[in-house]
Amino acid sequence: MEDFVRQCFNPMIVELAEKAMKEYGEDPKIETNKFAAICTHLEVCFMYSDFHFIDERGESIIVESGDPNALLKHRFEIIEGRDRTMAWTVVNSICNTTGVEKPKFLPDLYDYKENRFIEIGVTRREVHIYYLEKANKIKSEKTHIHIFSFTGEEMATKADYTLDEESRARIKTRLFTIRQEMASRGLWDSFVSPKEVKRQLKKDLRSQEPCAGLQTKVSRRTSPALKTLEPMWMDSNRTAALRASFLKCQKK
């Protein structure tokens, strides 16, 4: 699994995942499934934010080629991938600037168009189960939740999927590719252990609390990219490099 992760994810994503695990005293060489899961989550967060800007009229637009116009503002602030101290500094700055309520837990992104924090989830299980876990943990309707699965399903707070269908399809395609590549290497079954999932489901169901007022809907429609964190946004050369990395697995 470790070899797969290093072959199929951008080196910057791998480095961020290693740092995140070491921050919590975890070893990527031992907890390889977690290593793969963290890399996948990081990539989805970066892909979620890619190419999305806000123009001078406050409208959300997509710019995929070349350097964006200087008048454009990046729609999403990336919080995931930073060390905890820096991440909370970014969150506090956003709250002080926008007046939004400070979340109890570190979110993954901030959406400047909708003025809300976003929690991204990537699950190997049923999307509605994972959604409930996230909602029960966060216990706040102010943080928007968006869950993706490796099967092309998704679920979001109040069925508001934030992104256009093409952007979401790009994420779903990448997740499906990761699943196929794991399966071709005989890694998928160990990544999704039925016994482990069953035990976790029983534990989750025992600890669940009602999520009143959270309207959800599952989308079953199945229809690259990485921003640097400092500086935050990617130039066209880096985008092209990541596109090549994105296609690496498919070419094997």
UniProtKB/Swiss-Prot annotation:
It comes from the Viruses. The active site is at E80, D108. Gene3D superfamilies: Influenza RNA-dependent RNA polymerase subunit PA, endonuclease domain (3.40.91.90). It is found in: Host cytoplasm; Host nucleus. The record marks K202, K203 as: Important for efficient shutoff activity. Keywords: Decay of host mRNAs by virus, Eukaryotic host gene expression shutoff by virus, Host cytoplasm, Host gene expression shutoff by virus, Host mRNA suppression by virus, Host nucleus, Host-virus interaction. GO terms for molecular function: RNA binding. One of its GO terms (biological process) is viral translational frameshifting. Its main location: host cell. InterPro entries: PA/PA-X, PA/PA-X_sf. The record marks K195, K198, R199 as: Important for efficient shutoff activity and nuclear localization. The probable endonuclease active site in the N-terminus and the basic amino acid cluster in the C-terminus are important for the shutoff activity. The C-terminus acts as a nuclear localization signal. The C-terminus is recruited to host protein complexes involved in nuclear Pol II RNA processing. Plays a major role in the shutoff of the host protein expression by cleaving mRNAs probably via an endonuclease activity. This host shutoff allows the virus to escape from the host antiviral response. Hijacks host RNA splicing machinery to selectively target host RNAs containing introns for destruction. This may explain the preferential degradation of RNAs that have undergone co- or post-transcriptional processing. Belongs to the influenza viruses PA-X family. This is Protein PA-X. It comes from Influenza A virus (strain A/Ruddy Turnstone/New Jersey/47/1985 H4N6). The gene is PA.
